[in-house]
Design a protein with these regions (language model features):
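ASCE RecA-like P-loop NTPase motor cores
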Residues: 1-137
Length: 137
């Protein structure tokens, strides 16, 4: 219901037209729930994967939950946890989560990925290298 109303506004038409060409687009002034609704509508119209950049992991998690509620498959790409000193017991949960999101992106199972700015600045393996070293059971 809300998507139909949103798609008839001139602002939606303008941002949808700007996404027709390659490159980034920025949006300011909407509350988080409004942004999630707009992004979900744009993703459904364009069929492109959304990359939503947030200030931190908490915001990314909240945004991914909002997008899931609106019918998209979304995940959070967490930042890498650096260990600069020897530690007795270090978990690899964040590494596994990062690999899981990369695998879902490479496999086409995600409509959106929410990325904290810190994670966006960290290196990842190139897609062809990732797929070459992936084993599906």
């Amino acid at each position: 219901m809300y998507e139909a109303l949103l798609k008839n506004t001139p602002e939606y038409q303008k941002i949808a037209a700007s996404l027709a060409s390659p490159g980034p687009a920025a949006l300011f002034g909407l509350p988080p729930a409004g942004r999630a609704l707009l992004y979900a509508a744009l993703q459904k119209d364009t069929g492109r994967i959304l990359c939503v950049v947030t200030p931190g992991e908490a915001e990314a998690t909240h945004f991914a939950d909002d997008l899931k509620t609106l019918g998209l498959s979304a995940a959070v790409f967490p930042p890498r946890d650096f260990m600069l000193r020897p530690v007795e017991g270090a978990g690899r949960e964040y590494e596994y989560r990062r690999l899981s999101v990369l695998g879902a992106l490479a496999g086409g199972r995600l409509n959106a990925v929410c990325v904290p700015a810190e994670a966006l600045l960290q290196y990842t393996v190139p897609q062809d290298e990732f797929q070459k070293n992936t084993l599906t059971l």
